[in-house]
From Swiss-Prot:
It catalyses: a 1,2-diacyl-sn-glycero-3-phosphocholine + H2O = a 2-acyl-sn-glycero-3-phosphocholine + a fatty acid + H(+); a 1,2-diacyl-sn-glycero-3-phosphocholine + H2O = a 1-acyl-sn-glycero-3-phosphocholine + a fatty acid + H(+). By membrane damage, for example, by phage-induced lysis or temperature shock. The protein is inactive in the monomeric form and active in the dimeric form; calcium is essential for dimer stability. The active site is at 162 (proton acceptor), 164 (nucleophile). It comes from Escherichia coli (strain K12). Keywords: Calcium, Cell outer membrane, Hydrolase, Lipid degradation, Lipid metabolism, Membrane, Metal-binding, Signal, Transmembrane, Transmembrane beta strand. Ca(2+) 3 binds at residue 204. Its EC number is 3.1.1.32, 3.1.1.4. This is Phospholipase A1. Belongs to the phospholipase A1 family. Ca(2+) 2 binds at residues 167, 172. GO terms for cellular component: cell outer membrane. Homodimer; dimerization is reversible, and the dimeric form is the active one. Residues 1-20 form the signal peptide. Binds 1 Ca(2+) ion per monomer. In the dimeric form the Ca(2+) is bound by different amino acids with binding of each Ca(2+) shared with ligands coming from each monomer (Arg-167 and Ser-172 from 1 monomer, Ser-126 of the other). The Ca(2+) ion may have a role in catalysis.
């Protein structure tokens, strides 16, 4: 653990170091949004003060899983009748609280991401929601153009993340994290790394880092109009983790056809220690680019 803390300290200090490189930072707040940059997008001024911005991807897909974690939801009176096919959707939005808090390329922001697994076809049990994860964040972000070895560092973000399924015992799952998010691009490639440090009480899931690790890695590739994506988390000490692959293609100006495959542990909080493979297809409103 001391080794991990020693590694994380410089990571969490990196945002301030990058911000200090004033010579490499351009004023992007009044320029066209940088492709794939969450922070540059949030720095765009709009006439409507209530404008919300996409944070993570927003999608709705119909899915089928290889196995269902009925043991974790045994306290639900419909658990034995739970189905393997579900509608999975994610809503993820951000709002700039204070643009320019530490210079023209900085923003104090908040985001909210909700991911749900809905037993839509289970009409005999009134189509219940098997699991919903609620993930609010408060963060400080910087839009940069720091270049290294052909890559351009676009987003530097550090903040506080709360992730919970909003349930009471015995199905309550939650954890709190301090995190840093770094996003860089190189041509059609996008790479994002998000290390975190768990804080507070994890009594509901004391071994969650065993399966979820201490970071998330995300990779995107723009292939013509299509976007290929991969993201995952892994604990090198335990050998547990999970990965998600995605492919999207535009079908209208604002809607994309989306296919997703998730395999491993941690697809949801209730399944953080459960191994499965889920395949889904549906629509998406925004991808990584």
């Amino acid at each position: 653990m001391r080794t991990l803390q020693g590694w994380l300290l410089p990571v969490f200090m990196l945002p301030m170091a990058v911000y200090a490189q004033e010579a490499t930072v351009k004023e992007v707040h009044d320029a066209p949004a940088v492709r794939g940059s969450i922070i540059a997008n949030m720095l765009q001024e709009h006439d409507n003060p209530f404008t919300l911005y996409p944070y993570d991807t927003n999608y709705l897909i119909y899915t089928q899983t290889s196995d269902l974690n009925k043991e974790a939801i045994a306290s639900y009176d419909w658990a034995e009748n739970a189905r393997k096919d579900e509608v999975k959707f994610q809503l993820s939005l951000a709002f700039p609280l204070w643009r320019g808090i530490l210079g023209p390329n900085s923003v104090l922001g908040a985001s909210y991401t909700q991911k749900s697994w809905w037993q839509l076809s289970n009409s005999e049990e009134s189509s219940p929601f098997r699991e919903t994860n609620y993930e609010p964040q408060l963060f400080l972000g910087f839009a940069t153009d720091y270049r290294f070895a052909g890559w351009t560092l676009r987003d530097v973000e550090m903040g506080y993340n709360h992730d919970s399924n909003g349930r009471s015992d015995p199905t309550s799952r939650s954890w709190n994290r301090l995190y840093t998010r770094l996003m860089a691009e190189n041509g059609n490639w996008l790479v994002e790394v998000k290390p975190w440090y768990v804080v507070g009480n994890t009594d509901d899931n004391p071994d969650i880092t065993k399966y979820m690790g201490y970071y998330q890695l995300k990779i995107g590739y723009h292939l013509g109009d299509a976007v290929l994506s991969a993201k995952g988390q892994y604990n090198w000490n335990t050998g547990y983790g999970g990965a998600e692959l995605g492919l999207s293609y535009p079908i209208t100006k604002h809607v994309r056809l989306y296919t997703q495959v998730y395999s491993g542990y941690g697809e949801s909080l209730i399944d953080y220690n459960f191994n499965q493979t889920r395949v889904g297809v549906g629509v998406m409103l925004n991808d990584l680019f």
